[in-house]
Swiss-Prot record:
Pfam families linked: Ribosomal_L29
Annotated Gene Ontology cellular component terms: cytosolic large ribosomal subunit
Record keyword Cytoplasm present: no
GO biological process annotation, one example: translation
Family: Belongs to the universal ribosomal protein uL29 family.
InterPro entries: Ribosomal_protein_uL29, Ribosomal_uL29, Ribosomal_uL29_sf
Domain of life: Bacteria
Organism ancestry: Bacteria, Pseudomonadati, Thermodesulfobacteriota, Desulfobacteria, Desulfobacterales
GO molecular function, one term: structural constituent of ribosome
Record keywords: Ribonucleoprotein, Ribosomal protein
Protein name: Large ribosomal subunit protein uL29
Species for this entry: Desulfosudis oleivorans (strain DSM 6200 / JCM 39069 / Hxd3)
């Protein structure tokens, strides 16, 4: 996701997106460990998206 897309989310939408991204990251890690993941850069991209959403959520909590 692009940072502008994440900033446009409401607090509830951002929390839901965080749950979805964490589940996706778990699945990617599992597939990587079993040798089924071809595009390993998806791990890094998903991890960075999680960090972006967490940053936006912390801004809502201030």
């Amino acid at each position: 996701m692009k940072p502008d897309e994440i900033k446009a989310l409401s607090a509830d939408e951002a929390k839901q997106k965080l749950v979805e991204l964490k589940a996706a990251y778990f699945n990617l890690r599992f597939r990587h460990e079993t040798g089924q993941l071809d595009n390993t850069s998806m791990l890094e991209k998903t991890k960075k998206d999680i960090a972006r959403v967490k940053t936006v959520l912390s801004a809502y909590n201030r």
